[in-house]
Amino acid sequence: MNYFKLFNLPQKFELDVNNLTSQYYNLQKKFHPDSYQDKNIYTKKYLEKSMLLNQGYQTLKNMLTRAEHLLFLNNYKVDKKKKIVFNAKFLEMQIELFERLEIHKNKNNKHEINKILLEVSQIEKNYIKKLKNFCNLEKWKIAHSILYKLLFLTKFIKKTKKIQHEIIN
């Protein structure tokens, strides 16, 4: 299923999320079960359409799942469970980040953990720019590789924020 077509939106990485939301609500008005007084009229077909709209909306409103969907539409599957081998430079960065995080977690050093979080957030922003650029250029193989790096960074940021929260509390 092409969610861009479902919402009558251009098939590209950059998306007007307000327009997506507007399209979503307009379509949901037509297909949502609460719109039908007589539940006998509401069919399985409408329920499936409503669920499809929900799934499409959730996919397109998040830039990473939107990129994943774009890649899928261009024959690049993203398997989040698959272990990916990155280039040596990115692998070294991963190891260094985990080591630093572990050291400062054990020391309850919230200042250094904040520094790590800011640093990784900046790296993430740079990769988002790259992803946007390569999607716009339709360089799907490179975009695919960048998306995997972004998935790692997103997970690392989430883990770091959790540790940060634990230290504060």
UniProtKB/Swiss-Prot annotation:
Family annotation (Gene3D superfamilies): DnaJ domain, HscB, C-terminal domain
Keywords, comma-separated and alphabetical: Chaperone
GO biological process: [2Fe-2S] cluster assembly; protein complex oligomerization; protein folding
Any one Pfam family match given in the protein's UniProt record, by short name: HSCB_C
Start and end residues of each J domain: 2-73
Molecular function GO labels: ATPase activator activity; protein-folding chaperone binding
Superkingdom classification of source: Bacteria
Subunit structure, interactors included: Interacts with HscA and stimulates its ATPase activity. Interacts with IscU.
Function according to Swiss-Prot or TrEMBL: Co-chaperone involved in the maturation of iron-sulfur cluster-containing proteins. Seems to help targeting proteins to be folded toward HscA.
Family, per entry: Belongs to the HscB family.
Protein name: Co-chaperone protein HscB
